[in-house]
Structure formats: C-alpha cells, structure tokens
Amino acid sequence: INDIDNFFEMNNGRIFTLFDLGRNDLAIRSGLAKKLFKHRWGLVVAGSTIQYRKRVRLFDKVTIKTRLIAVDERWFYIEQSMWVKGQPTCSALLRTGITNIVTGKVLPTKQVLSALDYKDINMPPDDWVKAWSDADKIRPFPKANVHLAKDSAITE
C-alpha cells in the first residue's frame, strides 16, 4: 500500500527502490555480484537525477531497463528507465561506484573492470552525462551542524 500515492499511482520513492532491484539484477548477470562477495566490495550511488514523463498507475505492468552507459576513472554511470505498454514513463541517470566495505573508499573503475576481466573497456561519458556530473560537482552540499532558520518549515 505504500507503493501507491493518493492518486493510485506509483510514488517516486518506490520507483527508485525498483531501480535498486534493476541494478542488483545487472550486478548478478554481469558477474559483479560474485566479485562483490569475494573481495568484500559494496555498491554505492553517489548521485542521481530522474525525469518523469508518464504516470505508472495501479496494476500497470512495468518493465525496467538498466544499462551501463559510461565509465570514468572513479564512477560507473548507469541509465535506468521504466516502461509501461511499450512507452517510457521515467528515466534516471546514476553515478555509481564500487567500495571497499572495510575502508568505505570508492575503488578505481580499472580495478573493478580488471577483476571482471574487462580490461579494455573505453566508455567515456557522453557530453550530457559529463555536463550533469560536472554540474553536480559545484552544487552546494549542506554543512554539518548548521541549523535552519527558526521560521523554516523543517526543524530538528
């Protein structure tokens, strides 16, 4: 019941949860999941953006498509989309990484690709992916221990 909002449509939080499952499926099919357990690695989402175009209504059958679209020195860029009746409903771009679960540090993509025997992959980000990634680098992030104004709607 938490998947559906007041208008009998899938809520945006559930869409991201289903996209999590799509990335897990990609990890299993690519052989990455076995390497995660073997090397004590973890998956992390470092950034995401999503576009919504059509509603997903109660009882709609959805298809999720997940694909790796780019790799740089540190990040794997994944595009995910949800489809109903052959039409895209939403599309997300995610900047993801593989971490050492002991240290929490993001591993270089070359190290991960080498473990998967994909040593010669060359998938630089397209201009639109790079523009999003670059813009995200200059986006301000909240500072620790900074309290909101007293008239703010959100309080601690």
Question: PLM features: what roles do these ranges have?
Answer:
Residues I1-D25, R29, K130-E156:
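Catalytic strand-loop segment that frames the active site of acyl-thioester-processing enzymes
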Residues V44-V45, V56:
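Low-complexity, acidic Ser/Thr/Pro/Gly-rich terminal tails and inter-domain linkers that flank the onset
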